[in-house]
Amino acid sequence: MLTERQLLILQTIIDDFIGSAQPVGSRTLAKKDEITYSSATIRNEMADLEELGFIEKTHSSSGRVPSEKGYRFYVDHLLAPQNLPNDEIVQIKDLFVERIFEAEKIAQQSAQILSELTNYTAIVLGPKLSTNKLKNVQIVPLDRQTAVAIIVTDTGHVQSKTITVPESVDLSDLEKMVNILNEKLSGVPMSELHNKIFKEIVTVLRGYVHNYDSAIKMLDGTFQVPLSEKIYFGGKANMLSQPEFHDIHKVRSLLTMIDNEAEFYDILRHKQVGIQVKIGRENSATAMEDCSLISATYSIGEEQLGTIAILGPTRMQYSRVISLLQLFTRQFTDGLKK
């Protein structure tokens, strides 16, 4: 159990190191307004904190830096919520004011904005389409031969594709098809659409659409959509600006991993609900042993739909990043409920 004095000194060391990236010595601490102890007392407490494994000495300086154990204690017990500037709150909320909530577009933009606000790497795992339910279908003619099919799900995912309209299918047929599809398929999981169309809907269409065979062929292409999650990155190269990663050998394996999107897909798809913080070697990947990964899930009710994560050095601005992720996931969840 740490004393109040040790808690204050540990928190001040970590806060200072997060901001400066420089080892912290007793002289630096003695100049802090919140530290009212003598240099000798500070040195003694730092020695005890080092012996307990919360801070450690570097080879190049007489100062101390937080250890992984120190960061973990800091995150679990010392972290205070950070109020975000109003302009950042407005910037984030503006993402989610669109009348039609396009989850994939928002996910992509979220990754970019988060990377800019933090100067770290942002990763967003979009909703898994197979668990979405169809909300509605639109088929908008462009000319006599082509149209745009727009599929909207209950989570706000919008999938559009250009389709070829057979000459034998007229506008009246298109309108009847869309009405039948929306009446019969609204609320059906995307993973079941194809089977339901060809086991049930075709029978209904036969009684309403003149050129039945051509219409069915067109429908087959319309509902061939990818069902797996998409992963979006923002600021892939941001880690290069962090002093911890100026060593080219250290950063090469990390950048290789970031470029291998499938590896991050596996890391993020099984995240637990809520905010999760993995520090250093708590991460399963060796390339991330000098990094922290903070992730947050967004959901509707009890259904987890996706994950937003920030990858940075262990010397990360934990409080700020957590506040940003909480705001993003709150806005994302509210947007999906529209």
Curated annotation (Swiss-Prot):
Database matches in InterPro entries: GAF-like_dom_sf, HrcA, HrcA_C, WH-like_DNA-bd_sf, WH_DNA-bd_sf, WHTH_transcript_rep_HrcA_IDD
Q: Which residues form a coiled coil?
A: none
Q: Which UniProt keywords apply?
A: Repressor, Stress response, Transcription, Transcription regulation
Provide one Gene Ontology biological process annotation: negative regulation of DNA-templated transcription
Please verify whether the record's keywords include Heme: no
GO terms assigned for molecular function: DNA binding
Keyword Transcription belongs to the record: yes
Gene3D superfamilies given in the database record: 3.30.450.40, Heat-inducible transcription repressor hrca homolog, domain 3, Winged helix-like DNA-binding domain superfamily/Winged helix DNA-binding domain
Job description of the protein: Negative regulator of class I heat shock genes (grpE-dnaK-dnaJ and groELS operons). Prevents heat-shock induction of these operons.
Homology family:
Belongs to the HrcA family.
This protein is called: Heat-inducible transcription repressor HrcA
Name the source organism.
Bacillus anthracis
